[in-house]
Amino acid sequence: MSFSICLIQAVAFLDLLAVGLIVPLVSGHVRKMGGSHLYVGLLGSIYAGFQLGSGPLIGSLSDLKGRKFILIMTLLVCSLSYTVMGMTNSIIIILMIRGLLGLFKQTQMLTKALVPDYERDPHKQGEIYGKMAAISGAGITLGPMIGGHIAEDDPDNGFTFIATIVGVCFALNAGLVYFLPKSNKPVKRKPKISGEKRNLSYQLMTSVKQSFAVLYQVKWSKYWDIFMFKALVGFAMGVYYSNYSLYLKTTYELSPKYIGYVISFQGVIGSVSSYFIGYINSFYTHDDDYSLRNFHVFLLLSISLLGLLFSFNVMMYAVWLIPLAIGNAIGRLVTLEMILKRSHNDHRGTLIGASNSVRSLSGVVAPMVSGFIGQFYGISYVIYASLCSTLIGVVMSYHYRKRRVK
């Protein structure tokens, strides 16, 4: 493996390690500053909303200006943003920073886009992507544990210290990318465009419009039920994870250190489940349309959420996290496979794009719903919204399965 690929993998690892350090602590920090659950919900919705439009924008800029240059610039913006987040005492500024991060935090996408610039063999590229996923998964698993320990050892200044570390990590990543050798792959040159189209806000709005345009192109009469399954899984997990840390802290009085352990534990289970997806599929040799697997996913998620709801201690809670993580990991893959299976290669790219847009829209709506419930009914009631979503999925997937069998 070349030195350049090793550098790219190191950047991908350090990126998710840094994110894992701080993201689980942000909601608790905002609550400590006096922010309501609605503000906590806004944190997730603002980030997801900007991510919805920024992917095509950053990708287009990287084609125009060069992936290495754009990656360095975005990493430096993220470095400054996280550092300021740790120093500010204003919730409004934190919300603005989340929007800025949603716009510029595209490290994983850009590192994947950089791989073909330094490795031309398609077969080796697939192997590199697999290793990158495993290495990045290790980063997001270690991050919450380390961040939790630091936050617990220094409750007053721990968040500021962690934010500074995260800022340094992103700056270090920018330095690593700088040392990548110059790629021989030519940068695309676009024809000159008007001043209006050079404006970043215009390009962002164009990207958002393109996301909705993709949704408009889909024949919903043919695919609506599968996209509904996708939305139900995304909404259920989005609502649940939006107040995950606060729920553990409020219900079980866990310290940041142990919250980090629980988050890392669930991440490991999800990674292992994704790794063994081929083995899991071997039990469904006659389930050609994925309808049975889809029904089992919603059933597993519903049972898991019920188990979490009635858990009387954190050990029982951790046990029920295992089937929840498995169901979530498999569910993301099953809904995509159902879409591709029904498409018969017709508009496959459009359908994948629409699937991602549905997931992104769920990511925008879910945190706000979670924040609203937490604010007006209590944090312990948030999980009921996730349970309702998965139970609707159980009923729909059961009827879907019956129709397919007939």
Q: In which residue ranges do the predicted regions lie?
A:
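Structural signature of the two symmetry-related core transmembrane helices
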Residues: 69-84, 291-307
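Juxtamembrane intracellular "pre-TM" segments in multi-pass secondary transporters
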Residues: 2, 183-228
